[in-house]
Amino acid sequence: MISLVIPTYRSPEILDICLKSATENQSKKNEIIVVVDGFAEESSHILKKYTDQITILTFKNNKGMQTALNFGVMNASNETICIINDDNVLCKDWDKIIEEDLHPGNVLTINQIEPTGPGMFNFPVKDFGQPSEFKYDEYLEYEPTIRHSRLTVDGGIFPFAMSKQDYMTVGGFDTMYQSPFICDWDFFLKLELTGKTFSRTSKGHFYHFGSTATKNGKDGAMFKATEGPAADLFEYKWGIRPKLYANNSHNPKTGEIIKGIKL
């Protein structure tokens, strides 16, 4: 079994689609943990629809994505965890795909379909509409047509599956970041420094609406303002700016391995 961890923040419409896909498209019953990161009243009517199929953890006030994820993983009862955002739509047999392609010491990214592109992460592009008019059945019909079994090494991004023990070994996501951005780069860098490997599977593709509650949502301006300070914190901590280097655990200027925090 897999523990699927879904942090959610003020996005009831897409959360409904996410949970519908997670519950309907699993090949067997898994643990689905929803961490409500504040404003619980806005999504309570959605959560009630799935109350017998999910575990709900609620913060009265917004604590941030990092705290929500760490809390969700701490409460996961399975060793294999999968972390997604509430703006993901899961494909058929998502759990079977993870079980087939995730190996010990590996962090497995599940490929995504983006509505616009091309982007920096080289995701396939096809627009299935806004949440209010999302073409759910069309997505499920189209997605298998672009699957292939070749694993690639361009992982280290959301959504991803891994071992709970590996997640806890590096302390999860660093809550020093007061932003939903950059903290994931920090997390994957810590994993790389402990020798974990990264891969991406295209046996399945989750759909991604994209930052509906952060960059593009009702609190978008507030969240965008946190990205710069988060990048500064990353540089203070690691000595390099957060960028997509081929090997982010090495300083691109010197080639030397970064041993720890730069104080």
Residue ranges and their predicted role:
Residues K20-K29:
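Short, acidic, metal-binding catalytic loop of nucleotide-sugar glycosyltransferases
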Residues F59-A76:
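Glycine-rich, basic loop-to-helix element that forms the pyrophosphate-binding segment
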Residues V36-H45, V89:
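A conserved acidic beta->alpha catalytic loop
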Residues I81:
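Short aromatic/hydrophobic "clamp" motif used to bind/position activated sugar donors
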Residues Q66, Y139-M162:
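A recurrent flexible, glycine/aromatic-enriched loop bordering the glycosyltransferase active site
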Residues K92-Q130:
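Conserved donor NDP-sugar-binding/catalytic core segment of glycosyltransferases
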Residues Q178, R200-A221:
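Active-site donor/metal-binding and catalytic loop motifs
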